[in-house]
Amino acid sequence: MENKSLESSQTDLKLVAHPRAKSKVWKYFGFDTNAEGCILQWKKIYCRICMAQIAYSGNTSNLSYHLEKNHPEEFCEFVKSNTEQMREAFATAFSKLKPESSQQPGQDALAVKAGHGYDSKKQQELTAAVLGLICEGLYPASIVDEPTFKVLLKTADPRYELPSRKYISTKAIPEKYGAVREVILKELAEATWCGISTDMWRSENQNRAYVTLAAHFLGLGAPNCLSMGSRCLKTFEVPEENTAETITRVLYEVFIEWGISAKVFGATTNYGKDIVKACSLLDVAVHMPCLGHTFNAGIQQAFQLPKLGALLSRCRKLVEYFQQSAVAMYMLYEKQKQQNVAHCMLVSNRVSWWGSTLAMLQRLKEQQFVIAGVLVEDSNNHHLMLEASEWATIEGLVELLQPFKQVAEMLSASRYPTISMVKPLLHMLLNTTLNIKETDSKELSMAKEVIAKELSKTYQETPEIDMFLNVATFLDPRYKRLPFLSAFERQQVENRVVEEAKGLLDKVKDGGYRPAEDKIFPVPEEPPVKKLMRTSTPPPASVINNMLAEIFCQTGGVEDQEEWHAQVVEELSNFKSQKVLGLNEDPLKWWSDRLALFPLLPKVLQKYWCVTATRVAPERLFGSAANVVSAKRNRLAPAHVDEQVFLYENARSGAEAEPEDQDEGEWGLDQEQVFSLGDGVSGGFFGIRDSSFL
């Protein structure tokens, strides 16, 4: 009797799919609801076929697994229904494949039976496409064992034989790694100077910490055309103990392996003590703090001020209430309709990133009156209402953080080296956004003071970094006037440029410096005046003339140094007299068009602009592409992290931007979701089980 009543209660369940479901697997599963249609429990799901209860944690991997193990017929139906969805996910991988010429049915069967024509060519093309998907999409090699992936390829071409995971891991990926490595070795051999950057990240799935090392250089991508190059060199695991020693050893080995020991001029890092110590031990001249990391450090310090911290905590509780209460969510929607406000949910934030906090505060400010209307009618939650002074502080924080968001967006959209923009941006922020006004509240004034102190301490109170950034800015024809410096400071910058140019000329003369690019914009081997004298004078006709020439035409004395100095000063003066370039114009194109006019200054430019402003590409640091990359890296097996991240990063160099996730980025600047449901194709189809890493 008890079993019958249980069965009867289960069959009486009113199941509904997830309200934001995307995967077609929800056809077979649902949540239990009450009489009003509200979901009773979000962490329990029922199978519509066998009424089994399944735990739900935010993704659909266990749902498809339940179908595969218990309901094979429905699983096949589910796989077939998703074929088109899978086709779209892999469209890029197959876009380069040429359509096979049409054949008669008899001829087709004969070709399959004989094994020619198709196997040799088409098999290679499809295997190359699969390898491209794995490498450029950061998929683990175990994807070739996924049933749905096999179904996709069989649907695309039933004759194709998919290689094994072992072949992909031990042969195909290493061969592609070797080919790409040879190309990058040639690029670095031709580079005059290079900067490095270190991206420290953690794989949450494996609880391992990694460092991805990249090299950056300013070279000649085409004849008479300067271009910025960025190449990933290595990804290595760092232990919890002896981190600095490990990083130092690996960096040294990488410098030797890639032949850049004498070319590394600067390093851009998050300014962690371990990486800074490693760079110091390796005598890296410039330690450049990551601009994005510095922004976050200063803003997070401001958020930790007692009153601001308490306010942000109240804001998070308010958002959490609306996200977790179906009644409150419904009332919010109704109030938005009544007040003719666009329907949108409140935004939660991640405590560690300021961009998501800004998104939360902006949405609260937009919905201020709607929220107040809901809470007035909810007597049990009046304590969540914010006071007028708190709303004023929220408005002030939004106004304070908005320029930082605009700076982040500008850096992300920039197609040029960003190191020359650091000083102008800092000057703008320190003298406008962070300038304390009389109308500012005490909390807002303290926040501005804390952020300004962090920016100044990091960039302006270190003389070497300050001078480096000033020179990098001066060499940008958009900012060369340096209006934020005094006349004395500008003269110091110009003197540094002259010293750098003369130093490069001295290396040329000593034979210790001969970059490959000299064939494009050559540095003269001697002062122009003496070269003219030598070429215009006929060769000596006697031994006496040779002796006289040795006495009166010898080079390398004080006279030469003066002529070198005069040439550099003249070139610098010519550069200063050129028209200032527009802010939206390309500084690299400006220099490329004038390589013949300026034979020396581009050499200094290559040395200073190879150092980057951020430790990773700005569009990844500030944008939502960060989530895509992080999620993909997390699923890689430890043994393949180095090769696959290497191939992924170098495949994307100069390619289109990483497609953005729907969730917030590393900085939360693009966050529009209420919370991540993990309910998509990536969760249902490509959720890699733990056994995939074995």
Curated annotation (Swiss-Prot):
Localization in the cell: Nucleus, PML body; Nucleus
SUPFAM superfamilies recorded: beta-beta-alpha zinc fingers, Hermes dimerisation domain, Ribonuclease H-like
Motif (Nuclear localization signal): 530-534
Residues noted as binding Zn(2+) in the record, renumbered to the chain: 47, 50, 66, 71
Impact reported for residue 71 to A: Abolishes autosumoylation
SS bond list: none
Pathway(s) per entry: Protein modification; protein sumoylation
UniProt PTM comment: Autosumoylated with SUMO1, SUMO2, and SUMO3.
Region called Required for the formation of higher order complexes of ZBED1 with consensus DNA binding sequences, residue ranges: 652-694
Key words, A-Z: DNA-binding, Host-virus interaction, Metal-binding, Nucleus, Transcription, Transcription regulation, Transferase, Ubl conjugation, Ubl conjugation pathway, Zinc, Zinc-finger
Coiled-coil regions listed in the entry: none
Gene Ontology biological-process annotations: negative regulation by host of viral genome replication; positive regulation of transcription by RNA polymerase II; protein autosumoylation; protein sumoylation; regulation of DNA-templated transcription; regulation of transcription by RNA polymerase II
InterPro entries: HATC_C_dom, RNaseH-like_sf, Vacuolar_transposase_reg, Znf_BED, Znf_C2H2_sf
Induction per the UniProt record: Expression is linked to the cell cycle: low in serum-starved fibroblasts, increasing during the G1/S phase, highest during the S/G2 phase and then decreasing again.
Annotated spans, Required for DNA binding: 552-624
Zinc finger residue ranges, BED-type: 20-78
Purpose of the protein: Functions as an E3-type small ubiquitin-like modifier (SUMO) ligase which sumoylates CHD3/Mi2-alpha, causing its release from DNA. This results in suppression of CHD3/Mi2-alpha transcription repression, increased recruitment of RNA polymerase II to gene promoters and positive regulation of transcription including H1-5 and ribosomal proteins such as: RPS6, RPL10A, and RPL12. The resulting increased transcriptional activity drives cell proliferation. Binds to 5'-TGTCG[CT]GA[CT]A-3' consensus sequences in gene promoters of ribosomal proteins. (Microbial infection) Binds to human adenovirus gene promoters and contributes to transcriptional repression and virus growth inhibition during early stages of infection.
Protein name, as recorded: E3 SUMO-protein ligase ZBED1
